[in-house]
Amino acid sequence: MKKFTSEIGSSELILDDTKLNDVKTRLSRPEILADRIQRILNSNFVKMTFPVFNALFDGASTYYKEEISKDLKNSIIDGHVIAIDLSEPMDRIIDEDEDAEYLDDYKLMNPYILEIAREKISQGGDSVLKAFEEGFKDARLGQYIDYKMKTRPESINYENMIICYKKYRAVMGTAGRNMAFNRAPLGDIFHLGMAKAAECVGCGNEIQDALKQRSIKTPSWPLYYSLISKDVRKAFEITMKKSEIYLKEADLAVHMLPLEFQFKPFLEFLFLTVNHYNQYWYNELVRGDMLDSFQKDFNISVRR
C-alpha cells in the first residue's frame, strides 16, 4: 500500500488508515469481493477492448510470422485488460459520481490490481513493461489534471482538456503498442489507432455521463465548449464533431497498416461501432429533452 501511495502521489486515491480494517474485513467475504470486481468489469472500455486486443495480437503474430504461446498471449492481453480495469475505479474515486458507497473498497483493491497487471505484462519482456510504465505514468498525469479541473473549474481550458485525455489515450494506446510487443511498425500504428479510438469513446462517455447524472460532467468537452459558446446545445454538437476528429485520426492508423495485415476489415468495423456508440448516446440526449434544462443550470452557475 505504501509503494502504491508514493507511486500514485494522489491522496484522493488512498484509503484512510482508520478505515483499513473494516474494508479488509468486508472484502474478505468472497461474495462481496466478487461483487466489486463485477462492478469494475461493467465498463464500456473493458467490454470493447478484449476482442480488439485479441485481433491486434493475432494480427501482429501473423505479420511477424511468430508462434506465440497461448499462455503468453493471455498474460499480455489479460495484463492490459486488468490495467484498464484499474483505470475504472480510479476514475470513479476521482469523479465521485458512480459507486459512491464502494469507493473505499476500490481504494484497497487498486494496489493489488496494479500488481497483478504488472506481473502479467512483464512476461512480455523489458520493452513491453517499459512501454506500460510510461503509459501508466502519462495516464496518472491525465487523472491529476482531471482532478485539478474538477476541483478548480476556472482551470478548465483547451490545453488542460488535451492533457486530461491522457487518461484515455495513454492506457489504450500503450495496450495497442504492446499487442505487437512494442515493435515497429505495428506497435506505433496500433498505438495511434487505439489512443485516438479511446479519446473518441471518451467523448461518448461524457455524453452518457450527462444523461446518467442529468448534468454536464466537470470536466468534459461539453462543459468546455459550453463555457466558450454559452450555448449548451451547440456544445454537445461540437463535442460530437470533436469525437469525429478523434475517429478520423484513428482511421489514419488503419490506412497505415501494411497491405499484408489480415485484420484490417475487423478494425474498420470496430471504428464504425465506436462512431455508432457516440451517436447513440447523443441521440438519447436529444430525445431525452434535457438540453434546455442543462442550459438553465449552466446559466445559473455562470452568473454565480
Predicted features along the sequence, with ranges:
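All-alpha prenyltransferase/terpene-synthase fold signal
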Residues: M1-R304
